[in-house]
Design a protein with these regions (language model features):
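Long, contiguous binding/interaction regions
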Residues: 1-96
Length: 96
């Protein structure tokens, strides 16, 4: 997107469970690509179960959030669910 263009954005939380440690590098790459939109990230290693629980707070266009969540959910051994705020705001486009 070009800078200076307004777009509708929503705040969302993506909840991620990683059961396959080999997917973590690819997951981190996807999150890095969305870094301009990520508000915060919390990761909890649940060693007793051998899984990682990750929560991502994001403020971005809805199609970008849906795309990111879909890409994450297609990783082997990774599941993702997204909850959206009902509030839609205008924001200046980020340079991706």
């Amino acid at each position: 997107m070009r800078k200076g263009i307004e777009m509708d954005t929503r705040v969302a939380v993506i909840s991620i469970i990683v059961e396959n440690p080999e997917a973590i590098v690819t997951l981190n790459d996807l999150l890095h690509e969305a870094g301009n939109y990520i508000i915060g990230r919390m990761g909890i290693p649940y060693r007793e179960k051998g899984i990682n629980i990750i929560r991502i707070a994001i403020d971005a266009p809805q199609d970008m959030i849906s795309s990111l969540s879909g890409k994450i959910g297609r990783l082997k051994g990774v599941s993702a669910k997204t909850a959206y705020s009902n509030i839609i705001t205008k924001a200046e486009a980020q340079n991706d």
